[in-house]
């Protein structure tokens, strides 16, 4: 089984250790929910892009990878979650700076991105491409 907060929770439940599972859930600060919510945003953008585009509404999203923020630092420094963070492959071998993410957002809000519609822009140092090389 992989070493990540969700796997730790499932392992504890399979072993009948509900108390430890609850501890992991509390420690993970909603890691599972956070990941699922990012997927939900991406799916909503893709499903609404055509309809909203016809109404003149531009709809795109950014999918940032690990970025040096207080939330990232809290996870990276956590004694349990930090191990999972370290295990995430980043081909660029570092986390993003907030300015790097902001630059992509600035482009997406500019006239240069006027023709973009229904796009999810991954700014993750290549993590998505490495983990899902055939997904578009």
Per-region residue spans from a language model:
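Glycine-centered small-residue hotspots that permit tight backbone geometry or close packing
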Residues: 1, 53, 103, 125-126
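Extended hydrophobic secondary-structure segments
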Residues: 119-135
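A glycine/serine/threonine-rich, flexible loop-to-helix segment
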Residues: 2-20, 67-90, 130-136
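Catalytic loop of short-chain dehydrogenase/reductase
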Residues: 1-54, 66
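C-terminal helical subdomain
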Residues: 34, 39-42, 61, 69, ...
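Short, small/polar-rich loop/turn modules that mediate ligand/substrate recognition or access, typified
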Residues: 53, 58, 116-118
